[in-house]
Amino acid sequence: MIPRSCLRVRTLLTALILALFLTWTLSRWHLKAYILKSTGLSSHSPTDLTPSHHKFWQEFHSLLERHAPNTPPIVEYEKAKTASFSAHDPPLRPDTIYVPEDEIAIMKEAHTGFVNAITKSPPDLPYITGTKGIVSTAGGFYLPVLVISLRMLRRTGSTLPMEVFLADEQEYEPYICDTVLPSLNARCVVLSRILIAAPAKIHKYQFKPFAMLFSSFEEILFLDADAFPLNKPEHLFTTDPFLSTGLLTWPDFWASSASPIFYQIADLPPPPMDLRQSTESGEILLSKSSHTRSLLLATYYNYHGPSHYYPLLSQGAAGEGDKETFITAATAMHEPFYQVSEPICALGHPIPGGMAGSAMAQFDPVHDYTLTSRGVWRVKGDNAPAPAVFFIHANYPKFNPATIFEDHAVNPVFTDEGEYTRAWTIPEHVVQAYNARGDVEKGFWEEVLWTACELEDKFESWGGYQGVCEGVRDYWGVVFGSD
């Protein structure tokens, strides 16, 4: 028999442990509530669409397989040269891929069958009517980069919810997904929990359209993990050109390199090479209610991308992947879209003989549309003030605090002499224009510093790194300490 005194001690210890647990739980809840209140955000807890997504994916996966281009993969071909876009002196459309006529006919039949199926009776795509939000993909090395971009988004005052798609359970980091992201009105979505309904081999570079498909939002702004806006993006949803089209994209540096064979398969006339630039898909605005079919066809191109449609749409030129699939799909489905005409701008710092370019500036679509709707095309040489910079896509190398100070092919934070430098100082007129609202790069590094120091021991991908916070503090002190 246990003495009564021991029973009393055990009861008291149990009560104490329970009280401590409740206090810890309440403190976490109050901390999260305080963060949300202080930032003006509300926690994003949408209706669970997983059962509906399972049903949709089973039906849609069957459709993707039924209309697969059942021909050998396109793997052996001369890579097309990457040609810059010119509205005045466009290059010829490259034609480097050879596909036998009988295989073209098979692919055309499959493409036509898929288009007819989604035209007549598309699968019911689940989303919450009337919602708007931001969608991204991350995980592993990209998760710290995403947090920095998300904090830059919140600096604009935007309260749009965000859904961050991860590949699988291994990429789900509990502290980041359960504490950090919810405090910024964002949540993690594990893609494999949806795709398990009809298992398929989908690689990370194919994830973008799947994240867009399975987001809960009706209208989405997709942003790559390393892209962020300089202004609140809310108004983009409620003004032209998005309001009148339902699909908005931004340009890349290059001319189109889509193969003439693709246009045979899609039964479309090849567009003139001076019509528009190729697409830089780090930023996409899309309405599912108006462009479900375009999104379904873009997903078809990506699902069969590595074997067929990536080569057909780029022929191995720079950036081959999902970038050309979105407006190509809209064209094939005869659905409207608007691609910003203002040329993309490389940002960097000077080095002997050129620039260490580590980011890209994309411009305000509303300003751009105001010009083009009046017949003013700066890309064709018309004289007009430039639209404002709206997005910065800090794409190469990734500004991950754990690795940014390592040696890279492009070194954004070092001069050729090995001294610390600002990353984005040229073109001066572009940098001066967007800095009129405040020092953008300094603000960016404030978020890099916060992420490095507040979350140094939180990211699983940083487990093997030492001195992440210290490295960023050193850089900050030299470059911004006297500002």
Task: List where the protein language model places each region.
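Glycosyltransferase catalytic domains, chiefly GT-A lineage
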Residues: 2-483
